[in-house]
Structure formats: structure tokens, C-alpha cells
Amino acid sequence: MARSTARKRALNTLYEADEKNQDILSLLDERIAHPGAQTPLPDYAIEIVKGVAEHRRQIDMTLDEHSTGWKVRRMGVVDRNILRIAAWEILFNDDVPDKVAIDEALALAKTLCDDDSPAFIHGLLSAVCTAKNAAPAPESVAEEADEESSDSDAAASDPTDEGDVSDSSGASDEPAAPSAEIQPTVD
């Protein structure tokens, strides 16, 4: 079954859990055990639902951080869950390119949401991607810390080395990460 179909089925499950205020994993277990008239959930739909359930707090915080004026809890149920699926794919599923996650979210939004939603979803997911790509990977941060530690050890053992001369103002030569906040359109 195509991943697009799996995303739609995952959205149905997340939507139902959200509308019923039911635990996502409990509902997923019900859907797996008793699919009813529907065909069984595809493996990728199950992976999405489990991933969103496991990381929902972090996903919602990330979406809140990059969306001004609209907190996740105030978004439409369909919009909110499309965003959660795509954010999970962007942040936690390296098998899906960011662009594909955004394109798939937009395809769902264009068929299931109101006219303003696709632009909002696109802007918010683009901001999430920008922030993700601007942040150093956890392993590269650890490597940099090891290198700095080695450099400071070498400087401490060499009395002729005068060390780094740094600006006492604390300013950094590194450019600031771009602000990626999205303003919702209000008519």
C-alpha cells in the first residue's frame, strides 16, 4: 500500500483519538485488533501513529514554537493532526525527505481542510525544517566539545601560546539562526 494512503489512514486514527479525547495508542490497539469494515491499517500508518503518540509533546512544542498566534490546541483537528504527522516525519523519521513530508501534508490539506490551511501548513512545516537544519546534530555538538576540550588542553600545556583572543562583549562571529515564525492570516 502506498505511503500516501498510509498517511491518510494514520490521519483518520489520530483524528478519531483527538475528537474522542481518547488515548492514541489505546485506539490504535482497537483498530489493529478489530479493523471493522476497514481494511487493516498499513504498517506505515501504525508506525506514524505510534511515532506521533511517542513524541506528541515534543512535536506540539515544536509546532507551538514556530507558529505565532495559533497554538496547536487552537488549530482545527484535521490541520493539527496533518501537522503532527508531517512534523514526526521531519523530526523523527530519516527515511522520509523533509520535502516529501511537506508535499504529502499539503496534499492532505488541499483535500481535507479549508482554503487557508495549505498555506499555513506549508509555512509552519517549512519553519520546522529550517530550524531543524539550522541546529547542529547532537553528535556534531559532542565532537565540537571534544575538539574544544583538546584545544584547551593543548593551550594549557604550551606556555608560549597566548590562547584565543576573544571579544569581551560576548558577541559571536556566528550568524544568528533565522527567525522562522509564521503569522496566520486573519480575514
UniProtKB/Swiss-Prot annotation:
Xref: SUPFAM superfamilies:
NusB-like
What's one GO BP annotation on this UniProt entry? transcription antitermination
GO MF, one example: RNA binding
* Pfam families, sorted: NusB
GO CC term (a single one) = cytosol
Q: Where are the transmembrane segments?
A: none
Gene3D superfamilies to which the protein is assigned, alphabetical: NusB-like
UniProt feature, compositional bias: Acidic residues: 141-151
- Protein origin, superkingdom: Bacteria
**Any idea which UniProt keywords this protein has?**
RNA-binding, Transcription, Transcription antitermination, Transcription regulation
Which portions of the sequence form the region Disordered? 135-187
Q: InterPro entries this protein is in?
A: NusB-like_sf, NusB_fam, NusB_RsmB_TIM44
Family, per entry: Belongs to the NusB family.
What is the annotated role of this protein in its UniProt record? Involved in transcription antitermination. Required for transcription of ribosomal RNA (rRNA) genes. Binds specifically to the boxA antiterminator sequence of the ribosomal RNA (rrn) operons.
Name under which the protein is recorded: Transcription antitermination protein NusB
Q: Which organism is it from?
A: Bifidobacterium longum subsp. infantis (strain ATCC 15697 / DSM 20088 / JCM 1222 / NCTC 11817 / S12)
Phylogenetic lineage: Bacteria, Bacillati, Actinomycetota, Actinomycetes, Bifidobacteriales
